[in-house]
């Protein structure tokens, strides 16, 4: 074999080796890229909690919601097999709790996925002291909210709610309508995510701080609205916590909201009292659940319109294209518009 042939063979071997190594590198790069795209996942029962969780989790988790369709009732929701699988493979399952989405508790019990129950976390936070948790976030607004607003809500308004409604269902499971509760939830979520990814704990805390700062702006708007007269008829206790924080007075005849929420017709006496109240001129607005209706409710809405009483709609789910802050601001703006 002459020198020229040896050189040619050497070049071929070198080329083949280079192509082979390049292929390995390319394959490894693709695997790395594919791996980087596969983030840990969080599943939330509703798009409200998915949005709030996503704002805290940021780039390090993919967050999805089981329920985003406003025609779906979370109280009677049934998850598909695919959704059950997604929950079982998730790193965290965020549920509202408090009896609102009980289907989620059944789903969670069938998996090993850790559950973040907002209602239970808030109860534990109140027992431990909201100011302690807010202080951990390192944000001035969070501390103010935990100290000042918690006192207002717990001392002044909670007493009113307890006095007026007693043991009745007062909408306390609709905790996303309490700005203070949502602040505390964001802080607690940041702490939980920091446990799952300690290396990103500060990132989550910073995101929670930014979120709480935006909620603090809404609380200032809420505080300004609390000076207005707020006598209202509550066709559904959906936004009861928001109205309590505003210091508004619920004049709804006892038993109406409970019957409406349960899908039952109120008694003739309750209906007559409701009609008389709406026609009396005492109300600033009629509050209804935009996702539910009934012949009785439609008749009361018509009566309200004829009596010059504004009808304000409140929702259980985020409208498409809005985040939580924008959604709550729109609700406060709708209340401000009736002054």
Question: How would you label these PLM feature ranges?
Answer:
Residues 2-339:
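Extracytoplasmic metal-acquisition and chelation regions
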């Amino acid at each position: 074999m002459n020198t020229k042939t040896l050189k040619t063979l050497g070049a071929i071997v070198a080329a083949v080796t280079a192509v082979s190594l390049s292929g390995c590198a390319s394959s490894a790069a693709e695997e790395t890229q594919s791996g980087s795209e596969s983030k840990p996942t969080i599943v939330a029962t509703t798009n409200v909690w998915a949005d709030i969780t996503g704002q805290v989790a940021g780039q390090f988790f993919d967050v999805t919601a089981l329920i985003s369709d406003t025609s779906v009732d979370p109280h009677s929701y049934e998850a598909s097999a695919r959704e059950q699988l997604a929950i079982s493979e998730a790193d965290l399952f965020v549920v509202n709790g408090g009896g609102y989405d009980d289907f989620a508790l059944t789903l969670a019990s069938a998996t090993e996925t850790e559950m973040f129950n907002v209602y239970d976390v808030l109860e534990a936070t109140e027992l431990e002291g909201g100011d302690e948790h807010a202080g951990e976030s390192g944000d001035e607004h969070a501390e103010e909210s935990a100290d000042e607003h918690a006192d207002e809500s717990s001392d002044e308004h909670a007493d009113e709610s307890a006095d007026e409604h007693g043991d009745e269902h007062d909408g306390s499971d609709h905790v996303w309508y309490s700005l203070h509760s949502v602040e505390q939830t964001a802080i607690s979520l940041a702490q939980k995510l920091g446990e799952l990814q300690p290396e990103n704990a500060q990132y989550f805390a910073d995101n929670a701080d930014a979120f709480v700062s935006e909620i603090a702006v809404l609380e200032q708007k809420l505080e300004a609205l609390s000076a207005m007269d707020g006598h209202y008829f509550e066709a559904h206790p959906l936004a009861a916590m928001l109205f309590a924080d505003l210091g508004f007075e619920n004049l709804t005849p006892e038993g109406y909201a409970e019957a409406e929420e349960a899908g039952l017709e109120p008694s003739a006496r309750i209906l007559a009292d409701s009609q008389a109240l709406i026609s009396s001129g005492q109300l600033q607005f009629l509050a209804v659940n935009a996702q539910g209706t009934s012949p009785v409710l439609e008749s009361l809405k018509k009566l309200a319109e004829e009596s010059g009483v504004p009808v304000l709609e409140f929702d259980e789910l985020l409208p498409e294209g809005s985040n939580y802050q924008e959604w709550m601001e729109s609700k406060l703006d709708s209340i401000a518009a009736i002054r």
